[in-house]
Amino acid sequence: MVWTSHPVKRLAGAIRAPGDKSCSHRALIFGGLAEGESRFSGLLEGDDVLRTGQAMEAMGATVTRTGPGSWDVTGVGAKGLSSPKGVLDFGNSGTGSRLLMGVMAGYDLTASLTGDASLCSRPMNRVLNPLRQMGLKDTAGPDGKLPFTLTGSKSLKAIRYAPPQASAQVKSAVLLAGLNAEGETVVAEAKATRDHTERMLQGFGATLSFRMAPGGVHEIALKGGQRLRGLDAEIPGDPSSAAFLIAAGLLSPQGDVLVEGVMSNPTRSGFYDVADLMGASLGADERGEAAGERLIDIHSGYAGLKGIHVPERLVASMIDEFPILAVLAAFATGETRVTGAEELRVKESDRIGAVVAMLRVNGVEVEETEDGFTVQGCGGRVPGGGLVETRHDHRIAMSALVMGTAAQKPVSVDDISMIDTSYPEFMSHMATLGADIRS
């Protein structure tokens, strides 16, 4: 069904940030592995996260919803995970599927995995290759794409692994396999990626070490045989989801948007750093901590943005925010260049191609490159008037709908159903701010 976002004069209001998707996945996984019971509040109840919970239940954990965003998890502890009776369907969840591949590698179990058409087109060899070195067996073909069957090993071997591409999911899968491996597992990163796995594992009682190797390589080390213990935690607000609301405030001529309880983590701050470089009017107030993460309230109001060359050192810390950054670039004055972002080619869609198509159909001049794109900003309101093919990508859909609130003409999208994978409250939150989005 087509949905259309109509231009509005003002977006204003206060919104509590939805629970962070990355932390929500990890909470259910680590709680399911731990000894005893864990209790979580503020958990994101998007389809991706719920499928992770279902997978943990299928392998022996008890996962119970006790209220909106509140979940209790009783872990399997020392007895470990068991083979699920049916196929584990991860839907669109790359995070859940990849992290659980690492978990399954260290248990005496066999599991068949699948997903939707988008997930089954995404590369999994980048995760499978190091796990195979550790002892995982699988039935994946040469392209490493789902569906396939995994068989774990009780005698997993620790390795030192340097991922060829910066990827928090690959790092996390290897570290999670390392929990049950013989010896010390080390992941060596040339570029630091989001560190929620390391932070949350420590919260569950695991011991990790961090060191700097020659050449500025970051090493994360974990000794096998460690047991996790249950944890009570509040899930911090998702900075990637908050970015859509913050961008809406920046583009609204009378914008006055406050997003509360947003996680402030240097491995996730790239979008906000780049927005600041573009001249964004942002304010931040301390709010405390949740699950070992600093929380802030972020305020945004209208700002005349300018184009920049996005520093490549920030790419990994904003890999999910490039679609909404492209929208800001379209409204900015001057040229915005994105380079070093080839990882976008293998997200829920080919996000480089999807971003370029989204802008072009709405009258924005943009050039596609192999590792990014270059946007010629309109210096104000973009023409709009286009129908965006979302390619079943939730972040393309949300970005286009934000664009429509400040464009000259309404902007339409071909589908919004996939938004539920990461931000089920997006439509209601936008309506609270004053957006006019209709089917």
From Swiss-Prot:
User: Where are the active-site residues found?
Assistant: D320
Q: Where in the cell is it found?
A: Cytoplasm
E.C. number(s) listed in UniProt: 2.5.1.19
Pfam families per record: EPSP_synthase
**Domain of life, per the record?**
Bacteria
- Pathway, per record: Metabolic intermediate biosynthesis; chorismate biosynthesis; chorismate from D-erythrose 4-phosphate and phosphoenolpyruvate: step 6/7
Leading EC class: transferase
Under InterPro entries, the record lists: Enolpyruvate_Tfrase_dom, Enolpyruvate_Tfrase_sf, EPSP_synthase, EPSP_synthase_CS, RNA3'P_cycl/enolpyr_Trfase_a/b
Provide one Gene Ontology biological process annotation. aromatic amino acid family biosynthetic process
Q: Which GO terms describe its molecular function?
A: 3-phosphoshikimate 1-carboxyvinyltransferase activity
- Has the keyword Cytoplasm been applied to this entry? yes
- Residue positions annotated to bind 3-phosphoshikimate are K21, S22, R26, S167, Q169, D320, K347
- What are the binding positions for phosphoenolpyruvate in this chain? K21, G94, R122, Q169, R351, R395
Q: Which GO terms describe its cellular component?
A: cytoplasm
* Keyword Cell inner membrane found: no
Provide the catalytic activity annotation: 3-phosphoshikimate + phosphoenolpyruvate = 5-O-(1-carboxyvinyl)-3-phosphoshikimate + phosphate
- Which UniProt keywords are listed? Amino-acid biosynthesis, Aromatic amino acid biosynthesis, Cytoplasm, Transferase
Q: How does it assemble?
A: Monomer.
Q: What does this protein do?
A: Catalyzes the transfer of the enolpyruvyl moiety of phosphoenolpyruvate (PEP) to the 5-hydroxyl of shikimate-3-phosphate (S3P) to produce enolpyruvyl shikimate-3-phosphate and inorganic phosphate.
Per the similarity annotation, which family is this? Belongs to the EPSP synthase family.
Q: What is this protein called?
A: 3-phosphoshikimate 1-carboxyvinyltransferase
